[in-house]
Amino acid sequence: MRQVTIPLIQSKSMFCVIYRSSKRDQTYLYVEKKDDFSRVPEALMKGFGQPQLAMMLPLDGRKKLVNAELEKVKQALSEQGYYLQLPPPPEDLLKQHLSSVGQNTSPADR
């Protein structure tokens, strides 16, 4: 009897490698391959500083990421080779409080 070999078809899993900025707090750079910043603009790398490895993360099968939109990350990695996650805007607690008590926060209206 003749043996038949059937090749396994493996889909390419999507991974990303996440680096923390050494210059900017809560700023992260996602790339496709570890230590490969070849598709990241030089000016961005200069402002980002020395990348510090934070984690490697499989994107397939995930429903969401903590501080980034999964589909935006996947699209950016595919199209430009990187995704830059910036920190959330600072909370303006005074503005929130004044708004909750019905006061206008515009300096012109004071």
Curated annotation (Swiss-Prot):
Pfam families: YcgL
Biased composition annotated in UniProt, kind: Polar residues: 97-110
Highest taxon in the source lineage: Bacteria
Region (Disordered) residue spans: 87-110
Domain annotation YcgL: ranges: 14-98
Gene3D superfamilies: YcgL domain
SUPFAM superfamilies reported for this sequence: YcgL-like
PANTHER family linked to this entry: PROTEIN YCGL
The protein's name: Protein YcgL
Source organism of the structure: Salmonella typhimurium (strain LT2 / SGSC1412 / ATCC 700720)
